[in-house]
Amino acid sequence: MTTLLSLLPLLLVIALLASGRVSALVAGLAGLAATLAASATLVMGNAPDAGGTDAVAALFRREVPAGLWLSWHVIAIVVTGVFFHRANQARAVAGSAGTIEATPRRLFSGCFLLAPFAESVTGFGVGYIIALAALRRLGIGGLPALLLGLYSQSLVPWGALAIGTTVGATLAGLTPNELGLLCALLQIPIHLLYLALYWRFAREAGLAVPLAQKLDDLAWTALLLGLVWLVNLASDVEIAAAAPTAFLLALRYWRDERPGLAQAQATLRASAPYVALTLALCATRLVTPLRDLLKPLWALKPFDNQPAFAPFYAPGFWLLSIGIAVVLIARAPLGRVVAETARGAWRASAVTLAFVLMAEFYVGSGMATAIAEALRGAAGRGAALGVPLFAATGGFLTGSGAAANAMLMPMETALARALALDPAWMAAVQNSVTANLTMLSPIRVSMGAAILALSASDAVLYRRAWPLALPPLLTGFAAILVLLARA
């Protein structure tokens, strides 16, 4: 009975999302309601006589504030990230349109550097929008553009300044840097497999990549992955993708375009908000005196097992500040930008709140542990092989690393402990696979089809795109097999 009650909310969410008839918000609210009812029932049943009501009240008093606090960290970046993007849209820099010659070097920069950079600093598909715009400038459209545009999501474990990784780390009992470092190692085989598929997609788009350029692509991919790992090790996880992609993008621009002074100045003006944001985030995390000043300044930490919130150190402060400056300099109507932000951010914020609260109650009520024990009893150590499938399903259905981690991380880390496996690596598999599979979520694919005005059916789109699921899934299964062999 305990296992069935514990599973019902998860199964309900998966069934609702898989049906395609309800949104992630409706599924999240239904899952939260079912979780609250199931956790209250189990806590009352386990409490001594006449003490059930008090136990349920204590559970709610403990988990609701904790869930709201963890949600706030995500929502603060959701709202400010959308505001930053809308501010740049309002800026409407002249001269950003027009087509340019398509070359393999420009295609690589757009797919693996420019678009992932945009996704890492704002998230929520913004990188995909920028990727499609860049591909159209290269004269690539239709289904090939949709497939290549999905590479904007190739560093999503660090997307939106790593909010999904931060949520996953908190629920797994790790620091964000610890989880980010493990995910950076898993991203190496994932990215190399992505690269092999990219060459095929580029050829199908009419832009075959010669051997010399493939070697060049490999070298830059190795450099990118090495820098992502290094930044995870030496700095904060929030900039682990933003800083390397920005640095390499500037380096590639200088090498490939050899711009004159006027062209370089025009490019700098067009990208000034992103340059300012990257410099601000890097300075506050790499310049020791500045970091030591801002990190404790007015910091709030109401829960010992949850991250602190330092308002002047948080990425959202810089997204908001630079976004406001962009609006004021462009003399755009601030009220309109705020209204567009509210319309664009409220749903993602509500989805995050529902799934994070659901996760808190799964942990606090013991339901995650109950499911893990049941899986161990039913499948033994082989139950661990289900983790990549759970993670892939969560990422595909929700389209959000934060939401999928909130839904699944408590159960999977509990399973790791029940099987005497390393919970940190189990958390890394969950986070890496679920984040990478968000690129194939119906939310992303339908967005690309709408922007490109594709008339092809979903079946046709997924028949071409499904190989992109293989790199994270194969890596996830391989990692679990290594964990089982070492245990």
Q: Could you say what each language-model-derived stretch is?
A:
Residues 74, 86-92, 117-129, 155-162, ...:
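Short helix-coil transition sites and intra-membrane helix breaks within transmembrane domains
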Residues 126-136, 163-174, 402-415, 444-457:
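Re-entrant/interfacial helical elements at transmembrane boundaries that shape
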